A protein has these predicted regions:
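N-terminal Rossmann-like FAD-binding beta1-loop-alpha1 element of flavoenzymes
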Residues: 30-57
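Conserved N-terminal glycine-rich FAD pyrophosphate-binding loop of Rossmann-like flavoproteins
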Residues: 61-98
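Redox-cofactor binding/interface segments in oxidoreductases and associated redox assembly factors
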Residues: 35, 77, 236-237
Length: 258
């Protein structure tokens, strides 16, 4: 059902400029073909193209139609399982490496954005983790102290009496602020990745679904809605939009609660 005056696209997409001109003719052969034009696909394409390999990115919809431009834009150091839980399963050394990936990811995005000069509203605003009960507040403070002492993740506690300076609300029982966490405009970030890809001579085509990938003696034959492409290598970057096109990957993609 369509309602008058209601748009089905996120309102923050209105802050984007005109979509850059994309590829309209499918090349017959490329070094690298990337399936999916979200953050993962474009990031991979930027690297392969800058490395001198002809690169084509295909998407079944508009580039960035999915979660890459529709997420909340929070960038944190969070890896869900605690160091204690990971240590019990993998041992302390591997657990620390897994947890460190969260910190590395935050720093990488910040450094990449600054180095490349991306216009995507990246800001170091911090993240407030709210307590729902007084007991929850004590737990959050204790866990934050462990993160600081064991993993050098900076934070500070905000008791309920000082909460309004962070939220302007008395709805919670205090909380903890992780001061290094950032926010970003997700659609602008994607648009800037698209700009970098096009600048590196990546060919990007939307509304060109890949229907079959077959291995050949020289690489892969990729069948699409608009023709066939020969590729030396194929990168599947479809994440949550993975289909039976790649059943092995489809079986390994699972939803994770936010």
């Amino acid at each position: 059902m369509t309602l008058p005056g209601i748009t089905q696209s996120p309102y923050w997409h209105e802050q984007l400029g005109e979509t850059p001109e994309l590829c309209t003719t499918l090349p017959g052969q490329v070094d690298v073909l990337v399936v999916g034009s979200g953050y993962t696909g474009l990031s991979a394409a930027i690297q392969t193209a800058r490395g001198g390999r002809t690169t084509l990115v295909l998407d079944s919809d508009d580039p960035g139609f999915g979660c890459s431009t529709r997420n909340g834009g929070q960038i944190s150091t969070s890896v869900k399982p605690s160091l204690e839980k990971l240590s019990a399963k993998f041992g302390p050394e591997k657990a620390r490496r897994i947890r460190a990936e969260g910190v590395n990811a935050l720093h990488w995005v910040r450094n990449f954005t600054e180095t490349e000069g991306l216009d995507c509203d990246l800001r170091r605003v911090g993240r407030f983790h709210a307590a729902h009960t007084p007991q929850h507040y004590e737990t959050l403070v204790r866990e934050a102290e462990q993160l600081r002492s064991q993993e050098n993740i900076e934070s500070f506690a905000v008791p309920r009496s000082e909460q309004r300076r962070e939220l302007g609300s008395d709805a919670y029982f205090g909380g903890v602020v992780f001061s290094d966490h950032c926010s970003i405009h997700p659609a602008k970030f994607h648009r800037e990745l698209l700009r970098l890809a096009l600048t590196a001579d990546v060919e990007v085509m939307g509304h060109c679904a890949v229907t079959r990938i077959e291995r050949t003696s020289s690489g892969f034959e990729v069948n699409t809605a608009k023709g066939v492409v020969q590729a030396r290598d194929v990168i599947v970057a479809t994440n949550g939009y993975t289909t039976a096109l790649t059943p092995w990957l489809q079986r390994r993609v699972i939803p994770i609660g936010s």
